[in-house]
């Protein structure tokens, strides 16, 4: 990694593996910037849905992505670090949790022109004192020179249960079986797509979180960060 660039921790993995929660906690603890790259795609999808745009139109969606006005923030919530996502200054965090929005994001993420449009935007989040980047190709493509790369995984069943618990009180009509089917479908699509498939970086540390709590994963990630960055991290 260039010594002129701020440090980066990448946390990749499939949906429901815990990468978002752990990433937010690390960013909050270190006072670093946070990037939820998956949210960028969901933001493009949400914006397209709000504007009734054709998700298969490469030119239209690429232009939307290129001009997307999005911001991330991490604040202290009732259960620790809590992320806030803004689209054109509107807090759309709750709107992004729907599976319809997630499906739109996965669909447009397969369009190379959209990925190119968002690549520069993602890299612009790399500012001092550092960045925690959560996604699917942070360690393989966006920040391939990151000093610490973590890849979280878990069984589809466990990830579906976690997502169900997140959504059941916030989204009406949600069912565990439907979430599991959608997760399995997204896994298949994400792992087999031609552009940036969901795979660990060759130098990533892989953590299976199936039998781990969020606190367990956070503790392990903190240990890895302290070993990697040493004096660069606040006490």
Tell what function each PLM region has.
Residues 28-97:
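N-terminal phosphate/diphosphate-binding loop that engages ATP/GTP or pyrophosphate donors
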Residues 20:
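Walker A/P-loop
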Residues 38, 89, 118, 132, ...:
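Residue-level signal for inorganic ion chemistry
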Residues 93-170:
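ATP-dependent NMP and nucleoside kinases share a basic, alpha-helical "lid"
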Residues 16-17:
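ATP-binding Walker
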Residues 11:
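Hydrophobic anchor at the beta1->P-loop junction of P-loop NTPases
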Residues 122-128, 136-141, 145, 170-220:
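Small-molecule kinase domains that catalyze NTP-dependent phosphoryl transfer to phosphate-bearing small molecules
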């Amino acid at each position: 990694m260039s010594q002129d660039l701020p440090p980066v921790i990448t946390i990749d993995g499939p949906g429901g593996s815990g990468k978002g929660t752990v990433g937010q906690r690390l960013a909050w603890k270190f006072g670093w910037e946070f990037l939820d790259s998956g949210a960028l795609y969901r933001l493009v999808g949400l914006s397209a849905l709000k504007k009734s745009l054709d998700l298969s139109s490469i030119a239209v969606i690429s232009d939307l992505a290129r001009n997307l006005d999005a911001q991330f923030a991490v604040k202290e919530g009732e259960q620790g670090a809590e992320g806030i996502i803004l689209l054109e200054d509107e807090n759309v965090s709750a709107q992004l949790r729907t599976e319809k929005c997630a499906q739109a994001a996965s669909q447009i993420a397969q369009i190379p022109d959209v990925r190119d449009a968002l690549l520069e935007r993602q890299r612009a989040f790399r500012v001092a004192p550092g960045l925690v980047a959560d996604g699917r190709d942070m360690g393989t493509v966006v920040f391939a020179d990151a000093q610490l790369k973590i890849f979280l995984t878990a069984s589809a069943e466990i990830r579906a249960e976690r997502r169900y618990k997140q959504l059941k009180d916030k989204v009406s009509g949600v069912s565990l079986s439907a979430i599991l089917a959608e997760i399995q479908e997204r896994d298949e699509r994400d792992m087999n797509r031609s552009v940036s498939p969901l795979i660990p970086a060759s130098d990533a540390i892989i953590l299976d979180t199936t039998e781990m709590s969020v606190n367990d994963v956070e503790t392990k990630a903190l240990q890895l960060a302290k070993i990697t960055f040493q004096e660069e991290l606040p006490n």
